[in-house]
């Protein structure tokens, strides 16, 4: 089976956007195969078409903000959006269960993409005696925020797998937060692929930290990650947007072999 995908780099984190059709029953296996084959990649998403309308699909129905940015940037270039012009449209995800308002502006060698997040649920998570972590939930994903020293990094992947069962989420990310530097290191776990991946950056994680900081930060905050900074805007009535630059690479075709 021939498989075509496009690598998209967002703050040095590479998402593979699969543009050829893949049956839903094969997406998890395909994503796992690509992550093993392209070791520089950190996430895999799929584009499906309902007539002329694109839709973002993920391996396990999880929310992928980086995937939304990748598809938005690719569509802008594929549709010839002029340099400096902003294109706004709602992007459907996972069978249309969710729609994310997206805006994209091609500039120089990249596209600046802004995604408006769904409303978050911000609570606490107490997986064991003596440990309580901030928890930010969006439809299809949960983010745990670990202040410096709260969780040992060497044990993080195993803990994340364990906690994901307690949280009953298709994807869970653990964000190692440094308050003084306003920075975090993201570790993402996916139930569909069964893998935990250290990320250079995570757009959804940036939005989650922004939601958590609401009331303690201004209307906008720049959050640093290993791959670079992302801008988060905190609007009224709980609105949150995250903005980052996306670099769309050349399409590649491989023979998919399980």
Please report, for each region that a protein language model flagged, where it lies by residue:
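Surface-exposed beta-loop interaction hotspot
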Residues: 107-157
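A glycine-rich beta-to-alpha transition motif near the start of alpha/beta enzyme domains, typified by
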Residues: 1-110, 144-258
């Amino acid at each position: 089976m021939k498989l075509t995908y496009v690598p998209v780099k967002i703050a040095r984190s590479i998402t593979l956007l699969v543009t050829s059709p893949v049956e839903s029953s094969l997406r998890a296996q395909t994503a796992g195969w690509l992550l093993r084959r392209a070791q520089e990649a950190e996430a895999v998403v799929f584009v499906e078409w309902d007539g002329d309308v694109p839709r973002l699909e993920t391996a396990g129905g999880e929310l992928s903000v980086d995937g939304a940015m990748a598809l938005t940037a690719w569509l802008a270039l594929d549709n010839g959006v002029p340099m400096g012009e902003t294109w706004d449209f709602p992007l459907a995800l996972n069978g249309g269960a969710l729609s994310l308002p997206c805006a994209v502006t091609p500039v120089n060698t990249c596209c600046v993409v802004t995604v408006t997040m769904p409303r978050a649920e911000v609570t606490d998570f107490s997986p064991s005696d003596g440990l309580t972590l901030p928890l930010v939930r969006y439809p299809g994903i949960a983010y745990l925020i670990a202040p410096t020293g709260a969780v040992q990094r060497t044990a993080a992947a195993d803990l994340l797998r364990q906690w994901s069962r307690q949280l009953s989420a298709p994807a869970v990310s653990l964000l190692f937060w440094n308050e003084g530097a306003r920075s975090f290191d993201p570790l993402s776990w996916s139930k569909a692929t069964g893998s935990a991946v250290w990320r250079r950056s995570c757009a959804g994680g940036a939005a989650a930290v922004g939601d958590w900081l609401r009331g303690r930060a201004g209307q906008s905050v720049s959050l640093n990650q290993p791959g670079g900074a992302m801008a988060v805007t905190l609007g009224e009535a709980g609105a949150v947007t995250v903005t980052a630059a996306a670099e769309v690479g050349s399409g590649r075709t491989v023979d998919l072999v399980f």
